[in-house]
Swiss-Prot record:
Biased composition (Polar residues): 10-28, 861-871
Gene name for this UniProt entry: CRWN1
Descriptive protein name: Protein CROWDED NUCLEI 1
Native source species: Arabidopsis thaliana
Composition skew (Basic and acidic residues), residue ranges: 849-859, 1095-1105
Motif Nuclear localization signal 2 positions after renumbering to this chain: 693-700
Length: 1132
């Protein structure tokens, strides 16, 4: 809301003062007003009193306009304060949003840590798998040793077979020798043979027959043997088919292993992602370190600024010792508020830390459970592998047995060679599987490292974001009123940073442990590679041995074939010899034939029986082995499919979870960036407002300099007035009265040290900069008093005695119509001194602008030109921010002191007019000591008529009536201080006024404090005496300028007033300025006079002395005001 302001445009540009009491100092030229005034106080002549009422009425109108603008400014102040509260609410909402996002970040960090723990468990499982593989390698070595042993045993068996063949050849040779002996006997008996040739020929025919029969039987035997060979070949085919089935099952197993390898590759990819995350976390840690460096640099800058503020504080403390009590109270309140905020912040931090620790523990437990489950699965797999290996060993044993049974035959050798080749293929496949498993383990290790890197990176980024958010909060909260809170928050930030560092150290330690584990794992893999190389060498040795065995077997086969051929040749030879010796050996051959046939049949039957038994056993063994293998394969297939489905489901679930988490993290980052932009924009807006406020403050400082020059001009006018009085002393009628008048010397009232004020105003800019840091210190650091009680302090003590309605607090609930008759009634009793005092209103506002710190901008802006109206709104905002704390304590006294100089001045003008008429045309009675109520009645009648007009002029704004009323009552107080020319009849009216105003004092003390105090009330006003005591403590800075200016005004025209500010007696005797101000009718005046004397003698101001200023009306005869003396002079 920007309301138009009515600016006071009557005074002209002041000239340079030439008063000898002003210490010869001059300040700023000031801004020119719009319209100059032709007449001034120095030009007032007593021979033309008709001009005085007009000028006084003009001045009063200008005061009305000034007060109206003041009310508008206060309304604008209230609106700015409401806007400030709205901004504070928005800022709190932003802080709540930041807290929620921080919690979300903590949850994301917990999830990432859970993943990290799961990956660690997977690493443990993989290590266990590596150990299992080592065990499997050991078992393979044992199997190789067993194979070597079996090969050696088979070689020994082959050697035994060779030896048996050699023994048989020896037996054949023995038989040949026996045949040679028989041939010798045949030769011997050749004669007998010749003899019996005929018998031999006869027998020869019979032998031929028998031979043919033997050949037939031999052919039948060969047919049976061929059938047996075919049966053996079919059995071998069946064995080959079984082996092919086993090979197919092995292929299926390999396919499943390939699928498992693919899943392992996926896990390795995840490990790589974790490593990338780790890299990101390291980068985030570097950013956090940079931010910590920035924070340390900012802390150093703050320390330098604090040193500067300490220097300024020392200079201010020398000037503001009297305000220490107020400072202590404010500091205590600030400490309480800061302590509460710090406690709340600490509680929030503790709660967040506890939640974080609980989440971490839960995640660790879940990861441990998952690791245990994975370990159990690995153990199951190991048991299955062991079972498979046992079955394979059993199969190998069965094959070994079969090979041992067929050692005597060539087909048995071929079967053994095929079995050896199959086992070699199986070994090669197992080696390939080991290599693939090794690759999978390496990939899994890389995936785990990548996941760990990701987790660390995410945690680092979250920590960096948290630190940035905290820093932004601290920067927003670093104001001048909350410096101590900011320092405490900095200490808490340091603690949090230390905690983060400890956490980072723990993470680094964990990373180092993982690196050590990785190195140990790599060492183990190197050992496995060495073992694998050894195994390969052993396999090469085995293959060499196998090749040697094959060569040896081939040689043996060739040797056996040669032996068979030789044996056949020998048999043919024997047959030929037998044919030659048929006749001789007919009988022996028949006997031997019969014996051989029997033996051959027995051996044949035994061989057939053995072959059939072996066939049955082999078939039954093969069927059982095949059934067992089929069952095992089916069970393995089911288990493998189940495991495959589980692993695929787990992989899909992990992918979905990872995608969701990535989306959530991206959304959170976008939100944080948006909020950062909003916070930056708000911060820039606040900085722009601060710069505008500083510009306005500079303008106000210039205006204060201008007002000082006007005050010096007013002092020069006072000197002219005194010169005019001295010229009138030559008059016969006026000389006697003026000779009796004793004017108080202006030298007794020390003028303000303008050089000090200039220094204070020159230091206004650095104090404005300090206000950005601590408005409380800046508000307390602008007093005008020095180490001693200066001229301002004396003026304060003087004006506290001059206010007749100081202890009474007019109620804001009064209507303007009710207030105006009272003010006019009191104004009609005023004397001629008001004509001079009315011209001092401007200096009243000047001194109040110089002395007050919280409200000086509001007091001065009303005298600014039309061109400065645009700056007033911005100034009112700063005043609302700086003066809210002061309004809680001394808002009542300030409101009373602002506006007590208006309506009474109007009333005193009428009295001056009446007195002028009486001077020239009417005979007026002299002073009478008794009270007369007639003058009071006349004055009240005159005031009521004028009140109606003023009510009509002011009641246009209903909202401003309460404030205007309070300002008018304050105005009447100062007019009471200035209207000293009343007769004795005025005393009764003054007493009645005081009684009426004391009745409503308690109500107004509470309402006025709440009218323009835009903060929540922190205390409740009590009795009038207690409220005045708080005024004297908290509102010293505001009251001081008001009373000082009033004292200056009265001193400038030579007016000496009593403690109550109301003249009740006119004494035509010589006045003693050093006497005490006492009232013969009231004993309470003794205390008040003591307080007055203490203030004059530069002693501290007491609150109790001000509480009783309005209790009496009498004045000491030796200190009668110049107004009263002028009144007696005019009436005589």
């Amino acid at each position: 809301m920007s309301t138009p302001l009515k600016v006071w445009q009557r005074w002209s540009t002041p000239t340079k003062a030439t008063n000898p009491d002003s210490n010869g100092s001059s300040h700023g030229t000031g801004l020119d007003m719009v319209t100059p005034v032709s007449g001034r106080v120095s030009e007032i002549q007593f021979d033309d009193p008709r001009i005085l009422p007009e000028k006084i009425s003009e001045l009063e109108k200008e005061l009305f306009e000034y007060q109206h603008s003041m009310g508008l400014l206060l309304i604008e102040k209230k609106e700015w304060s409401s806007q400030y509260e709205a901004l504070q609410q928005a800022f709190e909402e932003v802080n709540e949003c930041l807290k929620q996002e921080r919690n979300a970040h903590l949850i994301a960090i917990a999830d990432v840590e859970k993943r990290e723990e799961g990956l660690r468990k997977a690493l443990g499982i993989e290590k266990q798998c590596a150990l299992d593989l080592e065990k499997a390698l050991k078992e393979l070595r044992a199997e190789n040793a067993e194979i070597k042993f079996t090969a050696d045993s088979k070689l020994t068996e082959a050697n035994a077979l060779v030896r048996s063949v050699e023994e048989k050849s020896l037996e054949v040779e023995a038989k040949l020798r026996a045949v040679d002996a028989k041939l010798a006997e045949v030769s011997r008996k050749s004669s007998d043979v010749e003899r019996k040739a005929k018998e031999v020929e006869a027998r020869e025919s019979s032998l031929q027959r028998e031979r043919f029969s033997y050949i037939a039987e031999r052919e039948a035997d060969e047919a049976t043997l061929s059938k047996q060979r075919e049966d053996l070949r079919e059995w071998e085919r069946k064995l080959q088919e079984g082996e092919e089935r086993v090979a197919k099952s092995q292929m299926i197993v390999k396919q499943r292993e390939d699928r498992a390898n693919e899943s392992d590759k996926i896990i390795k990819q995840k490990g790589k992602e974790l490593e990338e995350a780790q890299k990101k976390i390291d980068a985030a840690n570097l950013a956090v370190k940079k931010l910590e460096d920035d924070v340390s640099s900012r802390i150093k800058d703050l320390a330098l600024r604090e040193q500067e503020t300490d220097v300024l504080k020392k200079s201010i403390e020398t000037k503001a010792r009297e305000l220490q009590a107020l400072q202590e109270k404010l500091e205590a309140r600030e400490k309480m508020a800061v302590q509460q905020l710090v406690d709340e912040h600490q509680a929030k931090l503790d709660s967040t830390q506890r939640e974080f620790e609980l989440e971490m523990e839960q995640k660790r437990k879940s990861i441990d459970d998952s690791l245990k489950s994975k370990v159990a699965e690995v153990e199951k797999r190991e048991a299955e592998w062991k079972h498979m290996e046992e079955k394979v060993a059993k199969r190998e044993q069965a094959l070994d047995r079969k090979l041992e049974k067929h050692k005597e035959k060539e087909n048995d050798f071929d079967l053994r060679l095929k079995g050896i080749s199959g086992r070699e293929k199986a070994l090669k496949s197992e080696e390939k599987a080991l290599e693939t498993e090794k690759k999978k383990l390496l990939e899994d290790k890389e995936i785990i490292l990548n996941l760990k890197a990701l987790v660390e990176k995410v945690s680092g980024e979250n920590q960096a974001q948290l630190s940035e958010i905290n820093k932004e909060k601290d920067e927003l909260r670093v104001t001048e009123e909350e410096r101590s809170e900011y320092l405490r928050l900095q200490t808490e930030l340091k603690e949090q940073i230390e905690k983060c560092r400890s956490q980072q150290e723990l993470l680094q330690k964990e990373a180092e442990d993982l690196k050590a584990q990785r190195e140990s794992f790599e060492k183990e893999w190197e050992e496995l590679d060495e073992r694998k190389a050894k195994i390969g060498n052993e396999l090469k040795n085995i293959t060499d041995q196998k090749e040697k065995l094959e060569r040896h077997i081939h040689l043996e086969e060739e040797r056996l074939k040669k032996e068979k051929q030789a044996a056949n040749e020998n048999m043919e030879r024997e047959l030929e010899t037998l044919e030659v010796a048929k006749a001789s050996f007919a009988e022996t051959m028949e006997y031997e034939r019969s014996m051989l046939s029997k033996k051959a049949e027995s051996e044949r039957s035994q061989l057939l029986h053995d072959i059939e038994m072996r066939k049955r056993k082999l078939e039954s063994d093969m069927q059982t082995i095949l059934e067992e293998k089929e069952r095992e394969l089916q069970a393995k297939k089911k288990l493998f499919e189940e495991e495959r489905e589980k692993e695929l489901s787990n992989i899909n679930y992990l992918r979905d979870v990872a995608r969701r988490e990535m989306m959530d993290m991206q959304n959170e980052r976008q939100r944080i960036e948006k909020e950062k932009l909003e916070v930056d924009s708000s911060k820039n807006h606040l900085e722009e407002q601060q710069t505008e406020i500083r510009k306005d403050v500079d303008d106000l400082v210039a205006l204060t300099k201008k007002l000082k020059e006007q005050r010096e001009q007013f002092i020069s006018e006072r000197s002219r007035f005194l010169s005019s009085m001295e010229s009138n002393r030559n008059c016969s009628r006026c000389g006697e009265l003026l000779s009796e008048l004793v004017l108080p010397e202006i030298d007794n009232l020390e003028m303000p040290n303008m050089s000090k004020l200039a220094n204070i105003l020159d230091n206004e800019a650095p104090r404005q900069e300090m206000r950005d840091i601590s408005p409380t210190a800046a508000g307390l650091g602008l007093p005008v008093t020095g180490g001693k009680v200066s001229w301002f302090r004396k003026c304060t003590s003087k004006m506290l005695k001059l206010s007749p309605i100081k202890m009474t607090e007019p109620s804001v609930t009064w209507n303007l119509a009710d207030q105006e008759p009272q003010s006019t009634e009191q104004a009609n009793v005023g004397g001629p001194s008001t004509t001079v005092q009315a011209a001092t209103t401007y200096s009243f506002d000047v001194q109040k602008a110089e002395s007050e710190t919280g409200t000086k901008e509001v007091e001065v802006t009303n005298v600014n030109s039309d061109g400065d109206q645009s700056d007033i709104n911005s100034k009112a905002q700063e005043v609302a921010a700086d003066s809210l704390s002061n309004l809680d304590v001394d808002g009542q006294s300030r409101m009373k002191g602002k506006g007590k100089a208006r309506t009474r001045r109007t009333r005193s003008v009428k009295d001056v007019v009446d007195d002028a008429k009486a001077l020239y045309g009417e005979s007026i009675n002299l002073y009478e000591p008794n009270d007369s109520t007639e003058n009071v009645d006349d004055s009240t009648k005159a005031s009521t008529g004028e009140t109606g007009r003023s009510d009509k002029a002011i009641s246009k704004n209903g909202r401003k009536r309460g404030r205007v009323g309070s300002l008018r009552t304050c105005t009447t107080e100062q007019d009471g201080n200035e209207s000293d020319g009343k007769s004795d009849s005025v005393t009764g009216g003054a007493h009645q006024r005081k009684r009426r105003q004391k009745v409503a004092s308690e109500q107004q003390g509470e309402v006025v404090g709440q009218r323009y105090n835009l903060r929540r009330p922190r205390r409740v006003t009590g009795e009038p005496a207690l409220s005045k005591k708080n005024e004297d403590i908290g509102g010293v800075q505001q009251e001081e300028g008001i009373h000082c200016t009033q004292a200056t005004a009265t001193a400038s025209v030579g007016v000496a007033v009593s403690d109550n500010g109301v003249s009740t007696n006119v004494v035509q005797h010589e006045a003693t300025a050093d006497s005490e101000d006492t009232d013969a009718g009231s004993p309470k005046r003794t205390d008040e006079s003591e307080a007055m004397s203490e203030d004059v003698n530069k002693t501290p101001l007491r609150a109790d002395s001000d509480g009783e200023d309005d209790e009496s009306d009498a004045e000491h005869p030796g200190k009668v005001s110049i107004g009263k003396k002028l009144w007696t002079f005019l009436t005589t």
